[in-house]
Design a protein with these regions (language model features):
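Catalytic core of pol beta-like nucleotidyltransferases
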Residues: 2-3, 12-17, 30, 35-113
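Glycine-rich beta-strand-to-loop/alpha-helix junction loops that act as flexible
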Residues: 7-9
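Short hydrophobic/aromatic beta-strand micro-patches
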Residues: 24-28
Length: 113
């Protein structure tokens, strides 16, 4: 993992005692197999839950590169960066997400008012 963000209620400070931990990850390596790529965040969440002795579903992990751009933009703007192993990757992800969001926003504005 190069970057990890905390988002959702725990990042906003509105969590309840039973709230989950929503985490977005910029992975360092990517499996070649599509199925393994899709499972990568879920397997990481399960591994962390097992290591910490937490119930299933308490940790939720998404791959920042494979989520809707609106969610990614919300994570970048309102989430907290909690781990940065590669600062350049953080900057690139923030730039990529912001650029994609701007293109999407301009497209919708141009075509739908």
């Amino acid at each position: 993992m190069d970057v990890v963000w905390l988002y959702g209620s725990r990042a906003k400070g509105t969590e309840q005692p039973n709230s989950d931990f929503d985490l977005a990850v910029a992975f360092h390596s990517f499996p070649d197999d599509d199925w393994e790529l899709r499972l990568q965040p879920e397997l990481l969440a399960q591994s962390w839950s097992d290591q910490l002795g937490l119930a299933d579903g308490i940790i939720s992990v998404v791959d920042i590169n494979h989520i809707p751009i609106q969610l990614a933009m919300g994570i970048v703007l309102k989430g907290e960066t909690i781990t940065v192993k590669n600062t350049l990757r953080l900057i690139r992800e923030e730039h990529r997400i912001t650029s994609m969001w701007e293109l999407d926003h301009l497209h919708h504005r141009r075509h739908y008012g």
